[in-house]
């Protein structure tokens, strides 16, 4: 069905570019030591390549776990990118991706993936760093103290933007001025400039 499609959409072209510039072998090599193998009982794990592609697609389109699961059913382009044929198999569910993201976070692999992609882009001359644009984005958090300890998260602080006060953190994002590609992301308390 997908191969008979005549018009290539913007999403198709975007995912083709992501396919071309992403060092998939390096990403798999970085994650493989921590990824579960199919040696035990129960359902065998979904292939690492497929989970990485699903994770990258989720990040590119800013989707939630449920959102990427739905997108796999809705979008031929994303299905083709991830490598799923719905006539033969079902898409991985949101919980599977959640567990994969937790695995990446637990072993600090998200930073390794980010650095591998940026290193690969720099090698290909796609990340020039002739100038950097830095912006800070507020990430709101609930100011509630209704948790187990009865305390606020010590990493969160108040910050004022205009006349409005916010509670949470800031993401300081560095972007290459020429290409627009993100090369640095640092999270700090909300009161850090």
Each model region followed by its residue ranges:
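Alpha-helical support elements that line or immediately flank enzyme active sites
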Residues: 50-62
């Amino acid at each position: 069905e997908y191969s008979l499609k005549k018009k290539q959409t913007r999403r198709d072209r975007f995912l083709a570019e992501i396919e071309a510039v992403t060092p998939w072998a390096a990403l798999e090599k970085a994650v493989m030591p921590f990824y579960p193998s199919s040696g035990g009982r129960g359902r065998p794990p979904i292939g690492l390549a497929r989970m990485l592609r699903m994770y990258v697609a989720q990040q590119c389109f800013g989707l939630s776990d449920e959102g990427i699961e739905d997108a796999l059913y809705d979008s031929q382009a994303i299905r083709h990118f991830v490598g799923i044929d719905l006539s033969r198999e079902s898409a991985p569910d949101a919980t599977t991706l959640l567990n994969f993201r937790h695995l990446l976070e637990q072993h600090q692999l998200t930073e390794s993936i980010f650095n591998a992609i940026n290193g690969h882009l720099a090698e290909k001359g796609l990340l020039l760093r002739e100038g950097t644009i830095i912006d800070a984005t507020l990430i709101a958090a609930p100011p509630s103290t209704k948790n187990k300890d009865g305390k606020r998260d010590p990493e969160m602080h108040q910050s004022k933007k205009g006349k409005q006060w916010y509670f949470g953190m800031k993401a300081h994002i560095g972007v290459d001025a020429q290409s627009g590609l993100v090369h640095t992301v640092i999270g700090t308390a909300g009161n850090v400039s």
